[in-house]
C-alpha cells in the first residue's frame, strides 16, 4: 500500500474511532476497566476483618506480629492489544475483511485508553511474536499503532494463541488489561496459558468472524482454501448434508471456545464482520459493570 493511501486510511479510521471513543465509550470504558488494577502501597499491622491473604509473612516474622499489605487502585491502567495477524484474518465475504474490523476495534479501544489517561501497547502475533510495541501515551503513539494495524506484514500465516499469551505473561511485569483480537481459529489448545495469563492480568477476548465460516451458502461446487496452511479442496455446498456438517463443526468449535473462556474466567464477546461492533463492545462493557 502506498504511503499516501496508508495516511488517508489512518486519518479515516482516526476520525471514526476517536469519535466513537469520545462520544460513546468513554464512561463505559472507565467503569468497566478502572479499579481492576491494584498497586502495593504499604504494610500496616493486622486489624480484625483484614483478609488473611494480604498478610506479609516476611514482615510478620521480622516483628513477631501480623502485618498486612495495603493496596490502592492504580490511577492509570496499562492496556495491551494482542492482535492476531495470521492468514485467516485476511478473509471476508460480507462488507469487510476480518482484519479491517479488528483494526477498527483496536483503534477504538486505543483511543478509549488514551482518553482515560492509560498507556496502550500492542503485541502482533501469528504462530510467533511478530512485533511488540511497548505501552505509551499520546496521539502520535496511537497513530503509529493504527498505521501498523493497517499495513503490518507478518512473517508467518499460522496462529498460536498459547504462545502469545505466554509472551504476555513473561514480558508484562505489572498487571495490565489485555484485549485479544482474533477469530480464534487455532488448532492448538490455549486454555492453560489463558488461565495463567488471566491470574496475572485482566484478559478480555474479542472474536471477529465471517458469517460464511459459520454457515455455508448453497451455491454448488465451491473451492475452499485454508488461508494459514494453503490447503485447498472442493466441496459441494448444494448438499444439505455438507452444509449441516459444516455448521455442526462451527457450533462445536464455538462451544469449546466458550468453555475455555468460562473456565479461564475471561470475559468475551463475538462479533461478525457484517454486524455493528459498537453494540458488541457496549454489551461487553456492560457485562463487566
Identify the role of each PLM range.
Residues 1-130, 135, 177-180, 187-188, ...:
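An amphipathic, basic-hydrophobic helix/alpha-beta surface used to engage anionic
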